[in-house]
């Protein structure tokens, strides 16, 4: 007989430490692609002899970000037909399929196969992004939910920092190792799926009280649509940092893939610090929390692009950018 789940006074389930850990581990799956980020300059060198341009090399990071949009949309569709954990498993399979890029030959066809693997990774990553929050929102309630939401960003930032350091060290040996290194997190993914619980569903998504399916898009105001567009554009600028830092570090003569890994891990580490510090100053800037975050990112971005070959200013810009991003 299955053990009965303990519940609070409102009837909400009270899950233990293992489920909480699993829910937090979901966000780390989104950052697995950070293994590859520092290797961008190394990949560029590997494919330069066959005429692959810098723009095409940048697509190695850009394509996953683009496909992540479609992956996030796909989650909303699949939730109507299958369980949340099943969707998570599909997302993980797609994402770890991205490690196959490490097996691609250094030919023109091999490069396009590499990009195809990045399409799969992007879809998986995009599917994981909303699920990292929804598992916490669906499984936990009250103060525990708020606490886990805060920890989620910190855990993601710390894991991304670790992955970038490891990826940079692997890329020094071979760019292929950076891609294959993603598989190091497979045991954690298996543990995450095993410990997670399927959220209790009171009502099917998209169904109102009368049992009829509604159109969620009709409830979105023009102002909300405008915000979607504005923040979509801002996200494009954010990913410029992610996709070009490795190339910029090498172009400025600051170092190779390992140095790029350390610098980018600093950004994700600062994101984690910002996430942990946010509750301390939340609401203390007159509701302009998001504006302050964007301003910090803009300051950091400006310092980075104007730092030239000054490594100290590059690091300072990274700190500002990372804190704003977090």
Predicted regions and their residues:
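Helix-loop-helix hairpin linking two adjacent transmembrane segments in secondary transporters
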Residues: 151-197
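Extracytoplasmic gate region of multi-pass secondary transporters
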Residues: 37, 223-271
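Extracytoplasmic
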Residues: 17-48, 241-246
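C-terminal transmembrane helical hairpin of 12-TM major facilitator-type secondary transporters
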Residues: 287-326
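Central cavity-lining transmembrane alpha-helices of secondary-active solute carriers
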Residues: 59-77, 265-277
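Cytoplasmic helix-loop-helix junction between adjacent transmembrane helices
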Residues: 111, 117-155
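Extracellular/periplasmic helix-loop-helix junction of adjacent transmembrane segments
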Residues: 39-70
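Conserved MFS/SLC helix-loop-helix module at the cytosolic interface between two early adjacent transmembrane helices
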Residues: 70-109
């Amino acid at each position: 007989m299955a053990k009965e789940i303990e519940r609070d006074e409102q009837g909400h389930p009270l899950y233990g430490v293992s489920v909480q850990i699993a829910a937090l581990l979901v966000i780390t799956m989104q950052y697995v692609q950070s293994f590859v980020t520092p290797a961008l300059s190394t990949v560029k060198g590997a494919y330069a002899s066959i005429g692959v341009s810098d723009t095409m090399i940048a697509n190695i990071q850009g394509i996953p970000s683009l496909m992540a949009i479609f992956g996030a949309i796909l989650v909303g569709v699949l939730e109507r037909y299958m369980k949340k954990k099943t969707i998570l498993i599909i997302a993980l399979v797609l994402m770890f399929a991205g490690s196959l890029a490490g097996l691609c030959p250094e030919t023109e066809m091999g490069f396009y196969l590499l990009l195809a693997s990045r399409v799969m990774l992007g879809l998986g990553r995009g599917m994981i992004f909303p699920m990292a929050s929804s598992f916490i929102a669906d499984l936990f309630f009250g103060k525990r939910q708020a606490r886990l939401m805060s920890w989620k960003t910190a855990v993601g930032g710390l894991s991304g920092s670790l992955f970038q350091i490891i990826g940079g060290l692997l890329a020094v040996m071979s760019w292929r190792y950076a891609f294959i290194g993603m598989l190091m997190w497979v045991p954690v993914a298996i543990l995450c799926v095993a410990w997670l619980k399927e959220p209790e569903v009171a009502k099917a998504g998209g169904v109102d009280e009368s049992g009829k399916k509604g159109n969620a898009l009709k409830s979105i105001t023009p102002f909300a649509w405008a915000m979607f567009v504005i923040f979509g554009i801002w996200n494009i600028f954010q990913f410029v940092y992610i996709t070009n830092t490795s190339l910029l570090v090498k172009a400025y003569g600051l170092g190779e893939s390992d140095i790029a890994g350390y610098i980018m891990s600093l950004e994700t580490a600062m994101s984690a610090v910002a996430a942990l510090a946010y509750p301390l100053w939340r609401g203390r800037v007159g509701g302009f929390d998001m504006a302050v975050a964007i301003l910090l990112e803009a300051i950091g971005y400006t310092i980075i692009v104007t730092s030239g070959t000054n490594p100290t200013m590059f690091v300072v810009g990274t700190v500002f950018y990372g804190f704003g991003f977090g």
